[in-house]
Amino acid sequence: GVQTCALPISIIPAIGTKYDLGIAAFTITKERMQSVDFVSYFTAGMGYAVAKGNPKNVNPDDLCGLNVAVETGTVEEDAINETAKQCKADGKKDITIQSSKQQTDATTAVVTGKADVFFADSPVVGYAIAQTEGQLEQLGKDFDSVPNAIAIKKGDSQTTEAVQKAMQKLMDDGTYGKILQHWGVESGALDKAEINPSVG
């Protein structure tokens, strides 16, 4: 049978040793493709969330001097670290980065005022806004949209092909669309599940 396990850890390093595959909002990157194979199932960008009304006047184009919450092991954590380096190089105030093992902690940090903004994949931002019942709002629009995927042990073509066929069946028979609509994220729908799609 299938065993599932929800864990607050970096999943990709455990694919192929501890787990056969990982299902999360994995952003496909060339670097990650060196470690695992991917089957795309969704497209998502990145986004920011702030307290409703943006009381701290956060500007997404200038995060220097702010407290920014992110989830550990995400592309957003990498990106905010690069932004922080640029702030320092430009002689601006430092970004205080609050990395959390769970996204719920990053969300809570903004709701409680411990962080000015959180940075996450766009579906995560949308879900957090819905779950906090109006306490948060998205800052600006989604950006840098890329495919999200299921991660599978590198070179395990049998499992990779089985996952691709299963995802494609769900897309073709309408089940996938119904699931996305239920969660309010149908704007990220793909019509083709691809194995290791090209990324920029």
Where are these regions (language model features)?
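Periplasmic-binding protein-like
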Residues: 42-51, 76-81, 130-183, 186-200
